[in-house]
From Swiss-Prot:
This is Probable sucrose-phosphate synthase 1. Pathway: Glycan biosynthesis; sucrose biosynthesis; sucrose from D-fructose 6-phosphate and UDP-alpha-D-glucose: step 1/2. Plays a role in photosynthetic sucrose synthesis by catalyzing the rate-limiting step of sucrose biosynthesis from UDP-glucose and fructose- 6-phosphate. Involved in the regulation of carbon partitioning in the leaves of plants. May regulate the synthesis of sucrose and therefore play a major role as a limiting factor in the export of photoassimilates out of the leaf. Plays a role for sucrose availability that is essential for plant growth and fiber elongation. The gene is SPS1. InterPro entries: Glyco_trans_1, SPP-like_dom, SPS, SPS_C, SPS_pln, Sucrose_synth_GT-B1. It comes from the Eukaryota. The lineage of its organism: Eukaryota, Viridiplantae, Streptophyta, Embryophyta, Tracheophyta. GO terms for biological process: sucrose biosynthetic process. GO terms for molecular function: sucrose-phosphate synthase activity. It comes from Oryza sativa subsp. japonica (Rice). Induction: Circadian-regulated, with the highest expression 1 hour before the beginning of light period (in 14 hours light/10 hours dark cycle). Homodimer or homotetramer. It catalyses: beta-D-fructose 6-phosphate + UDP-alpha-D-glucose = sucrose 6(F)-phosphate + UDP + H(+). The keyword Glycosyltransferase applies.
C-alpha cells in the first residue's frame, strides 16, 4: 500500500479479529486493542459512539496471544501521531452509513489514545527518575555535612578528591580498583579448608541434564550457580561448597529434584586425601507446599521456612566439618552468597543469624525490570506487581544490600545504571565511606556494600574449536560425511532449510518477551540481502505443545510463527522443538562450520553467558548494547553492538559480519585469543581474592560453648567474654554493693530479681520445697548454685510469648498478664510436656517495664528461660549466673550485644532518625529515654496519623547509608530503632545457634495484631498459635504505604504451621491449638 494506506490494513485486520480471545468492547472493537478511556489526543474529544470507555487495558505478556494486541502494538510502536490523524481524517471524509466505517473511525481514536498514553508513561518515567536524582543529591549534601564534622581540613579535601574521581577515565578506575586487591588467591591457601555456601532458590536445579529453558525460572542462572559450585570446590583451600535450593517433590517434575542432596564433585585432589564431606553438593531445603513446584513469584511467603531449614543444615555441617578438618571446632561458612533477590533475602537472614559475611549477586534486578515494563506501556504498576511481585522483589534486594559486604556484578553498567537505582546504594557515598574507613574515621553506622565486577566463568575443557578453513570448503564436511556420522541435532536443524550450506545466524534463548526474538525475525524478514545470504536458526527452549506452555512463552512463539509466515521465511528459518543440553556445543559447532554469527538481541542482558559460549566456539557476535554484552565485546573484541529496538541496525550488523569474510575471521580470532579471561579458574581466583577482603565476623562464643552439660566442668577455665566482665565487676564494686544487701525491700523490679537470686544461692536441695521460689528456680537450686549456662541448652521445646497487648498510652495491659498465665497453665497441665519445655517472653518493652509487669502478676522472672526485650535489642536469662551482675541485677547477654553490634552506631541512628521523624511533623515525635538502651533508640509518637510509614522511613534511612531495623510498636505510640541484626524473629534464631534449641521446636504465641514486626515473626519453621481477641489493634497500619508489597507476600495465606484459638482465652483452648499445630506440622 502506498503512503499511509497500510494503517488501514492493520485497522481492517483488527476489525476482522473481533471474535479473538479476550475480545473487548462492543462491536468487535477488539480485545487487546482497548487502552482505557477513548479520549483522543491533542484537542480531540471522545467519540460518543466509541466503545473504548469500557475497554480493558492492553494485555501483558502473561496473557494468551491475541492477534488484535499484536496489530495494535505494531501501530503504536511504528506510527507517528500525524499519520494516525491523517488516517482518521480520511475515514471521516469517506464516511458512509455502514457500521464498519463507524467502527473504523472509533478504532483510530482508540489507537491514537494508546500512542499518547505510551508517551505520557515515558514522560512520567523521566520525571520519576529526575525526582529521585534530585532527592539523592539532597541526601548526599546532608550526609556530607553530617560526616564532615568529624574530618580535619586535610581529610575533607581528600574526601572531595574521592568524589572527583567519579569523572576519571574508565582505565584509571580499573587500575585503582585492582591496586586495592590483596595478594591473588593461589595454591598457598590450600591449608585453609574453607566452607562456602551458595544459595539459588528458584527454578529446577540439578547437576546433570539441566532442563534449561523449561520455564522462565530455569535459565542461565541455574547453569551458572551449578558450574560455580563445581569450580570453587576445585580451588586450593576450599574444602566444601553447598549450593542451597528449594526441594521440589511434585509429580510435575522429575524425582531428582526431591532428593535432599546431590554430589556435584568430590573436590580437589591435593595428595593429602579428602574427608567424606569434601566437594560440592546441591542441598535441597523444603519450604512451602511440599507437593507443588512454585514459580519464583509465589515463593516469597515461604522464605523464612527456607532460612530455618538451611540454618539447621549449616550448623550440622559445621559440626561435621569441624570433626573432619578442625579438631572438633566448628567450621562456619567462610561466606554466604545469595543469587537473585529471593536468595539475597535468605542470605541476609542467614548471615545475620551466624554472623558471617554475606555476598550478593543480583543477576536480574527488580527496579530495572519495573522501568523496562513501565516503558512498554502495556501494564499498570498494579498489574506488574500482581504478575511479578515486583515490589516484594525490590524490597528483597534492598534487604540484601543492607546485609551484604560485597556485591558481585558482571558488568560496570550493572553498577552504574542498575544498582544505582536502589535506595541502599550510592556510588559517591560509597567512596566517601570507604575513604573514612581507610583513615579510621567513624562512619556513624553508615555503610555501603562494595561493588566489584567479576565476569562469570565458563568451562572450556569440552569445547572443540573448528580449525580454520579455506574460503571454498564450507560444505565439504557434509559432502564427505554420511548422515549417520553427523550429530543428530545437525539433522534436526538442517531439515528446516532449503539450502543448509549458507552461513547461519544463531539465536539461543528462552522464548521470553525480553529476549526480543520477534524483532530479530522482523529484521531478518525485511532485509532481502540478508535472507539471500544466510539462514536463521532459532533455538527457543523445548516444547511439546505451544498451548501447554506458559502464556508469555506461548505468545512469543506464536508471534514468531506468524512472522515467518508473513515474510515467507519457510526454508530459511529453523526452529527445532527439542534439544538437549549436550546438543548446545554441537549447535555452536555447526554454526561455526557454516561461517555463521551468534546474536543476542535481548532488550537488556544482565551478562550474556551465551555470548561467551559462542566466542569459545569461534563465532563472531552481534549483541544488545544494553547490559553485560558491552563489557564482553570490549574484552573480546569479537563483534558488534546494536540497539535492540532498531531492527534495521540489527540487520545491518548481521549483514556486515556475514558478507565481510575478513571481518568475520578477525572477530573469530580475537574471540578465541581472549576467551581465557572468562575461564572458571580465573573467575574463582578473582572471586576468592575479593572474598578474602571481607571482614571475618565468626562469633567466638561458638567455639567456647560446651556441647552438653557434662562438659561444663571441663571447660570451666574457658570463660566467655561475659564471665570475664562478671569478674571485673565483682572485683571493683563488690564492697559497695555488699553494704546494701540487707536493706529494706525496694519497689525496683531489679531488686525483686536480686532477692530471688539470693534465695537461690542460699538454698540447698533439702529446703527447696519450703522456699517460695518459682518451679524453674527450684530446679536450678538442686545444684546449690545458679546455672552457668541457660537451661535453654537442655530444653526440647520453647514456648515464646510475644503477644503485643498495650493500652492507648503504650503501657502493657492486664490482658498480656492473662495470656502469660493461661499459657503457663496450658503447658503445665501436661506433665510430660512441662518437663521438657521452657518459656520465653518477647516484647518491645525495656527490661524495667517488663519486670514491673511480671511483678504485677506475681510471676517470678525465673519462670522464663529468656526475656527478649526492646524489640529484640536485648536478651536476658533470668536464672543464669552470666546474666546477673555482682549486685544481683539482671544484665543482657553480652555475646548477643556483640553479635548485633555489627554496623551499629547509637548516636548516628539517634541523630538521623530524629531528623527524619521530625521532618514536617512538628513536635509529634519526642525521645523516649526510659525505653532506650545502647542498642535501641526509642521515640514517643503523639499522633500516629502524622508519621511516615516504615516503608518510607526505610527508604530515607537507606539513602543515607544507615543499616538498621525500624518498627512502630506498643499501639503505634513508639518508634524504635535497633541494629540491623537485631529483631524479635532473629533473636529466636540466635537462641538456636547459641544454645542449640532448634527453631522447629519453638512455639510462638501471638495475637491477631501487633507491632510492625508482627508479620515477620509469623513465618518460619516454628509453630505459631494466634490467640483471637486479645489484641484489638496494633501498629500494622504503619508498615506499608500505597504501592508497596502486600502482607500475603510475607506471610503465607494458609500454613500448617499456624493455628488459631477459638472462643475465650482459656488454657484448654490454648492447649487444643498447640496440639492442632503440632499434629499438622508432623504431617508436613
Amino acid at each position: 500500500m502506498a503512503g499511509n494506506e497500510w494503517i488501514n490494513g492493520y485497522l481492517e485486520a483488527i476489525l476482522d479479529s473481533g471474535g479473538a480471545a479476550g475480545g473487548g468492547g462492543g462491536g468487535g472493537g477488539g480485545g487487546g486493542g482497548g487502552g482505557g478511556g477513548g479520549g483522543g489526543g491533542g484537542g480531540g474529544g471522545v467519540d460518543p459512539r466509541s466503545p473504548a470507555a469500557g475497554a480493558a487495558s492492553p494485555r501483558g505478556p502473561h496473557m494468551n496471544f491475541n492477534p488484535t494486541h499484536y496489530f495494535v502494538e505494531e501501530v503504536v510502536k511504528g506510527v507517528d501521531e500525524s499519520d494516525l490523524h491523517r488516517t482518521w481524517i480520511k475515514v471521516v471524509a469517506t464516511r458512509n452509513a455502514r457500521e464498519r466505517s463507524t467502527r473504523l473511525e472509533n478504532m483510530c481514536w482508540r489507537i491514537w489514545h494508546l500512542a499518547r498514553k505510551k508517551k505520557q508513561l515515558e514522560l512520567e518515567g523521566i520525571l520519576r527518575i529526575s525526582a529521585r536524582r534530585k532527592e539523592q543529591e539532597q541526601v548526599r549534601r546532608e550526609t556530607s555535612e553530617d560526616l564532615a564534622e568529624d574530618l580535619f581540613e586535610g581529610e575533607k579535601a581528600d574526601t572531595v578528591g574521592e568524589l572527583a574521581q567519579q569523572d576519571t577515565p574508565m582505565k584509571k578506575k580499573f587500575q585503582r580498583n585492582f591496586s586495592e586487591l590483596t595478594v591473588s588467591w593461589s595454591d598457598e591457601n590450600k591449608e585453609k579448608k574453607l566452607y562456602i555456601v551458595l544459595i539459588s532458590l528458584h527454578g529446577l536445579v540439578r547437576g546433570d541434564n539441566m532442563e534449561l529453558g523449561r520455564d522462565s525460572d530455569t535459565g542461565g542462572q541455574v547453569k551458572y550457580v551449578v558450574e560455580l559450585a563445581r569450580a570453587l570446590a576445585m580451588m586450593p583451600g576450599v574444602y566444601r561448597v553447598d549450593l542451597f535450593t528449594r526441594q521440589v517433590s511434585s509429580p510435575e517434575v522429575d524425582w531428582s529434584y526431591g532428593e535432599p542432596t546431590e554430589m556435584l564433585t568430590s573436590g580437589s585432589t591435593d595428595g593429602e586425601g579428602s574427608g567424606e564431606s569434601a566437594g560440592a553438593y546441591i542441598v535441597r531445603i523444603p519450604c512451602g507446599p511440599r507437593d507443588k513446584y512454585l514459580r519464583k513469584e509465589a515463593l516469597w511467603p515461604y522464605l523464612q521456612e527456607f532460612v530455618d531449614g538451611a540454618l539447621a543444615h549449616i550448623l550440622n555441617m559445621s559440626k561435621a566439618l569441624g570433626e573432619q578438618v578442625s579438631n572438633g571446632k566448628l567450621v562456619l561458612p567462610y561466606v554466604i552468597h545469595g543469587h537473585y533477590a529471593d536468595a539475597g533475602d535468605v542470605a541476609a537472614l542467614l548471615s545475620g543469624a551466624l554472623n558471617v559475611p554475606m555476598v550478593l549477586t543480583g543477576h536480574s534486578l527488580g527496579r530495572n525490570k519495573l522501568e523496562q515494563i513501565m516503558k512498554q506501556g502495556r501494564m499498570s504498576k498494579e498489574e506488574i506487581d500482581s504478575t511479578y511481585k515486583i515490589m516484594r522483589r525490590i524490597e528483597g534486594e534492598e534487604l540484601a544490600l543492607d546485609a551484604a559486604e560485597l556485591v558481585i556484578t558482571s558488568t560496570r553498567q550493572e553498577i552504574d545504571e542498575q544498582w544505582g537505582l536502589y535506595d541502599g546504594f550510592d556510588v559517591k557515598l560509597e567512596k566517601v565511606l570507604r575513604a573514612r574507613a581507610r583513615r579510621g574515621v567513624s562512619c556513624h553506622g553508615r555503610f555501603m556494600p562494595r561493588m566489584v565486577v567479576i565476569p562469570p566463568g565458563m568451562d572450556f575443557s569440552s569445547v572443540v574449536v573448528p580449525e580454520d578453513t579455506s574460503d571454498g570448503d564450507d560444505g565439504k564436511d557434509f559432502e564427505i560425511a554420511s548422515p549417520r556420522s553427523l550429530p543428530p541435532i545437525w539433522a534436526e536443524v538442517m531439515r528446516f532449510l532449503t539450502n543448509p550450506h549458507k552461513p547461519m545466524i544463531l539465536a539461543l534463548s528462552r522464548p521470553d518477551p525480553k529476549k526480543n526474538i520477534t524483532t530479530l525475525v522482523k529484521a531478518f524478514g525485511e532485509c532481502r540481502p540478508l535472507r539471500e545470504l544466510a539462514n536463521l536458526i532459532l533455538i527457543m527452549g523445548n516444547r511439546d505443545d505451544i498451548d501447554e506452555m506458559s502464556a508469555g512463552n506461548a505468545s512469543v512463539l506464536t508471534t514468531v510463527l506468524k512472522l515467518i509466515d508473513k515474510y515467507d521465511l519457510y526454508g530459511s528459518v529453523a526452529f527445532p522443538k527439542h534439544h538437549k543440553q549436550s546438543d548446545v556445543p554441537e549447535i555452536y559447532r555447526l554454526t561455526g562450520k557454516m561461517k555463521g554469527v551468534f546474536i543476542n538481541p535481548a532488550l537488556v542482558e544482565p551478562f550474556g553467558l551465551t555470548l561467551i559460549e559462542a566466542a569459545a566456539h569461534g563465532l563472531p557476535i552481534v549483541a544488545t548494547k544494553n547490559g553485560g554484552p558491552v563489557d564482553i565485546k570490549n574484552a573480546l573484541n569479537n563483534g558488534l553492538l546494536v540497539d535492540p529496538h532498531d531492527q534495521h541496525a540489527i540487520a545491518d550488523a548481521l549483514l556486515k559480519l556475514v558478507a565481510d569474510k575478513n571481518l568475520w575471521q578477525e572477530c573469530r580470532k580475537n574471540g578465541l585469543r581472549n576467551i581465557q579471561l572468562y575461564s572458571w579458574p580465573e573467575h574463582c581466583r578473582t572471586y576468592l581474592t575479593r572474598i578474602a577482603g571481607c571482614r571475618i565476623r565468626n562469633p567466638r562464643w561458638l567455639m567456647d560453648t560446651p556441647a552438653d552439660a557434662a562438659a561444663e566442668e571441663e571447660e570451666a577455665l574457658e570463660d566467655s567474654l561475659m564471665d570475664v566482665q562478671d569478674l571485673s565487676l565483682r572485683l571493683s564494686i563488690d564492697g559497695e554493693r555488699g553494704s546494701s544487701m540487707n536493706d529494706a525491700p525496694s519497689s525496683d523490679p531489679q531488686d525483686s530479681v536480686q532477692r530471688i537470686m539470693n534465695k537461690i544461692k542460699r538454698s540447698s536441695p533439702a529446703d527447696t520445697d519450703g522456699a517460695k521460689i518459682p518451679a524453674e528456680a527450684a530446679a536450678t537450686a538442686t545444684s546449690g548454685a545458679m546455672n552457668k549456662y541457660p537451661l535453654l541448652r537442655r530444653r526440647r521445646r520453647l514456648f515464646v510469648i510475644a503477644v503485643d497487648c498495650y493500652g492507648d498510652d503504650g503501657s502493657a495491659s492486664k490482658r498480656m498478664l492473662q495470656v502469660i498465665q493461661e499459657v503457663f497453665r496450658a503447658v503445665r497441665s501436661d506433665s510430660q510436656m512441662s518437663r521438657i519445655s521452657g518459656f520465653a517472653l518477647s516484647t518491645a518493652m525495656p527490661l524495667p517495664e517488663t519486670l514491673k509487669l511480671l511483678q504485677l502478676g506475681k510471676i517470678p522472672p525465673t519462670d522464663f528461660d529468656a526475656l527478649i526485650c526492646g524489640s529484640g535489642s536485648e536478651v536476658y536469662y533470668p536464672s543464669t549466673a552470666q546474666c546477673v551482675d555482682a549486685g544481683g541485677r539482671l544484665r543482657p547477654d553480652q555475646d548477643y550485644l556483640l553479635h548485633i553490634n555489627h554496623r551499629w552506631s547509637h548516636d548516628g541512628a539517634k541523630q538521623t532518625i530524629a531528623k527524619l521523624a521530625h521532618d514536617g511533623s512538628g513536635t509529634n515525635v519526642e525521645p523516649d529515654v526510659e525505653s532506650c538502651n545502647p542498642h535501641c533508640v526509642s521515640f514517643f509518637i503523639k499522633d500516629p496519623n502524622k508519621v511516615r510509614t516504615i516503608d518510607e522511613m526505610r527508604e530515607r534511612v537507606r539513602m543515607r547509608g544507615l543499616r538498621c531495623h525500624l518498627m512502630y510498636c506498643r499501639n503505634a505510640t513508639r518508634l524504635q530503632v535497633v541494629p540491623l541484626l537485631a529483631s524479635r524473629s532473629q533473636a529466636l534464631r540466635y537462641l538456636f545457634v547459641r544454645w542449640g534449641l532448634s527453631v522447629g521446636n519453638m512455639y510462638l504465641i501471638v495475637g491477631e495484631h501487633g507491632d510492625t514486626d508482627h508479620e515477620e515473626m509469623l513465618s518460619g519453621l516454628h509453630k505459631t498459635v494466634i490467640i483471637r481477641g486479645v489484641t484489638e489493634k496494633g501498629s500494622e497500619q504503619l508498615v506499608r504505604s500505597s504501592g508497596s508489597y502486600q502482607r500475603e507476600d510475607v506471610v503465607p495465606s494458609e500454613s500448617p504451621l499456624i493455628a488459631f484459638t477459638k472462643g475465650d482465652l482459656k488454657a484448654d483452648e490454648i492447649m487444643r491449638a498447640l496440639k492442632e499445630v503440632t499434629k499438622a506440622a508432623s504431617g508436613m
